[in-house]
Design a protein with these regions (language model features):
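Active-site or pore-adjacent capping/gating segments
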Residues: 112, 123-178
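Catalytic alpha/beta active-site cores
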Residues: 1-58, 80-90, 118, 124-128
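Glycine-rich and small/hydrophobic secondary-structure elements
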Residues: 28-33, 103-122, 144-153
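Anaerobic metallocofactor- and corrinoid-dependent redox/one-carbon enzyme cores
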Residues: 1, 9, 90-99, 107-110, ...
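Short glycine/threonine-rich loop-to-helix capping motif typified by GTGT followed
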Residues: 15-21, 56-68, 94-108, 135-145, ...
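Inter-helical turn/loop segments and adjacent helix faces that build the functional surface
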Residues: 38-43, 77-81, 135, 159-164
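Extended, hydrophobic alpha-helical segments in both membrane/secreted and soluble proteins
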Residues: 66-72, 76, 91, 110-114, ...
Length: 178
């Protein structure tokens, strides 16, 4: 069973990266407390949780946000007296960054979000259809979304490096600040 801890609503409502991270951790802690109150053993929660964050086109900041999420989760587990478990993290390209006036530019925005998700360490990267802002995505939009991830992985080798942003001054500093 997978339990989703999702902070995309904070992002899509205009929240900052710090607010999105705060919402994510608050959602996780609230879910754990509710499960505990209902009699469940919360020690199993970390390995059953799927954390979901939105990623926008500002890839430097988005990479740092994803890295900060992992650090924050480790601190939450420590504060609750639980063993540190790897965080299953999903990155979903932002709906608020998509425009209906020029949907073709959304391909570039989605590519930046896909890059941020991959380099930021997301286990699952989901790219929205570039024409989603116009209504129900058409076949071309869905196919492009799927292929964006494949091209990023195969052509640029994003999946071949364990931690491409590790040690980068900007990413480490911003992740710490967040």
């Amino acid at each position: 069973t997978t339990l989703r801890v999702d902070a995309r609503a904070v992002h899509e409502a205009g929240g900052s990266e710090a607010q999105e991270l705060g919402g994510l951790m608050a959602h996780a802690v609230d879910t754990m407390r509710r499960l505990e109150a209902a009699g469940y053993d919360i020690k199993a929660f970390p390995e059953q949780a799927l954390f979901t964050l939105a990623t926008g086109a500002n890839y430097g900041l988005e990479i740092a946000k994803l890295r900060a999420a992992r650090r924050l989760w480790a601190r939450v587990l420590e504060a609750m007296g639980l063993d540190s478990e790897p965080m299953l993290l999903q990155s979903v390209s932002s709906a608020r960054m998509l425009t209906r006036y020029d949907p073709w530019v959304n391909m570039l925005r989605n590519t930046a979000a896909c890059f941020a998700g991959s380099v930021g360490g997301a286990d699952i990267v989901t790219v929205r259809a570039f024409n989603e802002a116009l209504g129900v995505p058409e076949e071309l939009g869905r196919r492009t979304a799927r292929n964006t991830q494949i091209i990023a992985m195969e052509e640029s080798g994003l999946g071949r490096v364990a931690d491409p942003a590790g040690g980068a001054w900007f990413e480490e500093t911003v992740a710490t600040d967040l």
